[in-house]
UniProtKB/Swiss-Prot annotation:
Belongs to the protein kinase superfamily. STE Ser/Thr protein kinase family. MAP kinase kinase kinase subfamily. The gene is Map3k7. One of its GO terms (cellular component) is plasma membrane. There is a cross-link at residues 72, 158, 209 (Glycyl lysine isopeptide (Lys-Gly) (interchain with G-Cter in ubiquitin)). It holds the Pfam family PK_Tyr_Ser-Thr. One of its GO terms (molecular function) is magnesium ion binding. GO terms for biological process: angiogenesis; anoikis; apoptotic signaling pathway; bone development; I-kappaB phosphorylation; JNK cascade; MAPK cascade; negative regulation of apoptotic signaling pathway. This is Mitogen-activated protein kinase kinase kinase 7. Its cofactor is Mg(2+).
């Protein structure tokens, strides 16, 4: 028997032993691998390779282990998936024993991570989609936490493990290779640092509240469409160290207080201070009343050839000013806010302030008790053109306005749609492009021409030569164009010619104004960039100093550990000598 066949046989027998164990009651179908037609590799999971395949005339995803070390994760996922049945958890159709693989529901929309940060063109999505994804995720996790006789902890909640179907409107949780029973203690750190609760990598004791922490990070990520702790960079231990010291993702300007409160409660250092997933489901279900349109399929950017737009996705919420927060007990300082440069966001903010003033006595009814972090540092704005996060600038006004009677007031979802950047526009360095609502509209209709228009070509002077009357008036607005003259009246012709020349001069002045304004914007942008460069230089100096201090602290800690190790070794040698 070959090595490959021996490994396959060993995997098969191991899986078979686990499946047939009397203590395990697994609800799945054993599938003959010959019935499966593998089409293509689509990615990797908690273990092995994930492939798209056909099984009984339907699309499925199959997970195959690649090594013996992945067999344990395979058994874990098989055992956990066979226990669950929920619309927001990927469905297990069955398993093959030779070769060992899982046959599961196929998600044509890919992972939430790819929708947020994948290759272009990226889809547009609204605040309703973002809130709906988080609600569905919380519903699936709440189901896991409430399972009997033993609840489940996922332990690896993150956008790569959240799949989308039905045009991106339905979310399903996958990758149970790291899931465990709620009584289990962690023996080796699994999961991903950016979404991992501090207690998970600080020690081995943790509860289902570690999934709550991960969910709070995901909520921030889908609203901002930014990778959590992306500004820290480097290896994973740097993120772990920052989270251990109380660093959290930056707060979001214009985010409604109920959402911000829920999000920051999930980030609490103390797991007991975090809400349960059941409470999160109740709060999110209530908030979803203010976010209509979550059932609309995701839209991908189309090509606007007449405007010279690229099909790269842009930000839906780039007006949101962000400031980093640290959850240590310090006062808020150095809050840097990026000014909104577009009139639309200013109008939204004014609406928000008006509604807050009118409903100030009632607004407290929806307060969830903020646990906002304190020590604030500036997060450098991202300049990636593919940002398309959900704009929350108007939602709080809508929540406050309905707090009195509890009935949602219908507002246009267009207030929350994505924005685009026109290539000819000069935006601020805060990646705050001007707003372009996503509405299907035809080309701008031209102004109707006058009936029987008179043109200069129809007229000649008394000497029979053509008049060189400027044609600039044809580009003016209809109300500014000169009236057609009477060809038989010299006075009328003279007035018309004078009007045409004035129109040409008017167009020349307007063109100069436009060019000067454009140059002004360029100079402002250059000045802004210079200021940003100075700020970045200062930030880099501070970061370098911080890293030096951190390195010194770690070196000291290393020396202490080294001394402790030497003491322990010497004690052991003494014991061995005496024995």
């Amino acid at each position: 028997m070959s090595t490959a066949s021996a490994a396959s046989s060993s995997s098969s027998s191991s899986a078979s032993e686990m499946i047939e164990a009397p203590s395990q009651v697994l609800n799945f179908e054993e599938i003959d691998y010959k019935e499966i037609e593998v089409e293509e590799v689509v990615g990797r999971g908690a273990f092995g390779v994930v492939c798209k395949a056909k099984w009984r005339a339907k699309d499925v995803a199959i997970k195959q282990i690649e090594s013996e070390s992945e067999r344990k994760a395979f058994i874990v996922e098989l055992r956990q998936l066979s226990r669950v049945n929920h619309p927001n958890i990927v469905k297990l159709y069955g398993a093959c024993l030779n070769p060992v693989c899982l046959v599961m529901e196929y998600a044509e929309g890919g992972s939430l991570y790819n929708v947020l940060h994948g290759a272009e063109p990226l889809p547009y999505y609204t605040a309703a989609h973002a809130m709906s994804w988080c609600l569905q995720c919380s519903q699936g996790v709440a189901y896991l936490h409430s399972m009997q006789p033993k609840a489940l902890i996922h332990r690896d909640l993150k956008p790569p493990n959240l799949l989308l179907v039905a045009g991106g409107t339905v979310l399903k949780i996958c990758d149970f290779g790291t899931a465990c029973d709620i009584q289990t203690h962690m023996t080796n750190n699994k999961g991903s640092a950016a979404w991992m609760a501090p207690e998970v990598f600080e020690g081995s004791n943790y509860s289902e509240k570690c999934d709550v922490f991960s969910w709070g990070i995901i909520l921030w990520e889908v609203i901002t469409r930014r990778k959590p702790f992306d500004e820290i960079g480097g290896p994973a231990f740097r993120i772990m160290w920052a989270v251990h010291n109380g660093t959290r993702p930056p707060l979001i300007k214009n985010l409604p207080k109920p959402i911000e409160s829920l999000m920051t409660r999930c980030w609490s250092k103390d797991p007991s201070q975090r809400p349960s997933m059941e409470e999160i489901v109740k709060i999110m279900t209530h908030l979803m009343r203010y976010f209509p349109g979550a059932d609309e399929p995701l839209q991908y950017p189309c090509q606007y050839s007449d405007e010279g737009q690229s099909n790269s996705a842009t930000s839906t919420g780039s007006f949101m000013d962000i400031a980093s927060t640290n959850t240590s007990n310090k006062s808020d300082t150095n809050m840097e806010q990026v000014p909104a440069t577009n009139d639309t966001i200013k109008r939204l903010e004014s609406k928000l302030l008006k509604n807050q003033a009118k409903q100030q006595s009632e607004s407290g009814r929806l307060s969830l008790g903020a646990s906002r972090g304190s020590s604030v540092e500036s997060l450098p704005p991202t300049s990636e053109g593919k940002r398309m996060s959900a704009d929350m600038s108007e939602i709080e006004a809508r929540i406050v306005a309905t707090a009195g009677n509890g009935q949602p007031r219908r507002r246009s979802i267009q207030d929350l749609t994505v924005t685009g950047t026109e290539p000819g526009q000069v935006s601020s360095r805060s990646s705050s492009p001007s707003v372009r609502m996503i509405t299907t509209s035809g080309p701008t209709s031209e102004k109707p021409a006058r009936s029987h228009p008179w043109t200069p070509d129809d007229s000649t002077d008394t000497n029979g030569s053509d008049n060189s009357i400027p044609m600039a008036y044809l580009t003016l607005d209809h109300q500014l164009q000169p009236l057609a003259p009477c060809p038989n009246s010299k006075e009328s012709m003279a007035v018309f010619e004078q009007h045409c020349k004035m129109a040409q001069e008017y167009m020349k002045v307007q063109t100069e104004i436009a060019l000067l304004l454009q140059r002004k914007q360029e100079l402002v942008a250059e000045l802004d960039q210079d200021e940003k460069d100075q700020q970045n230089t200062s930030r880099l100096v501070q970061e370098h100093k911080k890293l030096l201090d951190e390195n010194k602290s770690l070196s000291t800690y290393y020396q202490q550990c080294k001394k402790q190790l030497e003491v322990i070794r010497s004690q052991q040698q003494k014991r061995q000598g005496t024995s």
